[in-house]
A protein has these predicted regions:
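Helix-biased detector of long, well-ordered alpha-helical tracts
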Residues: 1-206
C-alpha cells in the first residue's frame, strides 16, 4: 500500500513508522498522527471486560506516540458494533475510554459510529513533540545496542492481562528523544521477535 500513497511537502514522515510526522509552517512543534484498530477475536475476546477493551484501544495509540518521543494530546474514537450489542457493553467500552483519556490527559474530540458484524474500536491519536526531535524506526546504525524499557513476554503468561493493562512508555520515550540517547525507537506491541525485523528493515540493516 505504501508506494501507492502520495506525500505532501508538509509530511516529514509518512506511512511506515509508529506515527506520521507533519510540520506546520511557523510552529515550533511537529505533529504526530496515528491510528489503531482493536477488533473482537483479534485483539480481545468476547468475554474481555469492556472497560479493559476501551483502555487497551487508547493505550495502543498512546504507545505509538511514546515510541516517537512525543506527547499525546487528542483522540478520535470510531465504534463499529453489531445491532444486538447490549447497551451496557457499549457503556463499559466508553467508561474505559474515558478513564484512559483522563489517565493520559487526552481530549476526546469525537468520532463516529457504524453497525457491523464485529465489535471494533478504531482510535486516531494526535500528539506533538519539539520540531525535528522525532526518533524514527529508520535510525538504527551498525554497532548499536538493542534495549527495551520493560519486561518481555508478559502477554504470553497463562491468565495474563498484560496486553490489556500495559503501560505506554511516555516518560522513557520523551527522555530518550530529548537527550538523543536513542538512534531509533519503535513500539513493541507485536513483540520483539516480530518488531525488531521491522526496525532493521526500516533502517536498511536487516
Amino acid at each position: 500500500i505504501r508506494p501507492l500513497l502520495p506525500q505532501r511537502a508538509d509530511t516529514v514522515v509518512g506511512p511506515g513508522d509508529d506515527c506520521a510526522v507533519v510540520r506546520v509552517a511557523g510552529s515550533a512543534d511537529d505533529w504526530l498522527f496515528t491510528t489503531d484498530p482493536v477488533i473482537e477475536r483479534r485483539h480481545f475476546l468476547p468475554e474481555t471486560p469492556p472497560r479493559l477493551v476501551g483502555r487497551k484501544a487508547i493505550a495502543r495509540a498512546v504507545s505509538d506516540v511514546a515510541a516517537m518521543g512525543g506527547t499525546p494530546l487528542w483522540i478520535l474514537v470510531d465504534l463499529v458494533a453489531p445491532a444486538a450489542t447490549p447497551l451496557a457493553r457499549i457503556r463499559g467500552l466508553y467508561a474505559g475510554l474515558i478513564a484512559a483519556a483522563e489517565k493520559w490527559n487526552l481530549g476526546i474530540l469525537g468520532g463516529d459510529t457504524a453497525e457491523g458484524d464485529t465489535l471494533e474500536l478504531h482510535i486516531t491519536g494526535v500528539g506533538r513533540l519539539p520540531r525535528g526531535s522525532a526518533v524514527l524506526r529508520s535510525g538504527a546504525r551498525a554497532g548499536n545496542f538493542v534495549y527495551v524499557t520493560g519486561a518481555l513476554g508478559g502477554a504470553y503468561l497463562p491468565g495474563s492481562r498484560h496486553h490489556l493493562l500495559f503501560e505506554p512508555r511516555l516518560e522513557a520515550g520523551r527522555f530518550l528523544a530529548q537527550h538523543k540517547f536513542a538512534t531509533a525507537m519503535m513500539d513493541l506491541s507485536d513483540g520483539l521477535a516480530a518488531d525488531l525485523p521491522r526496525l532493521l528493515d526500516a533502517s536498511r540493516r536487516g
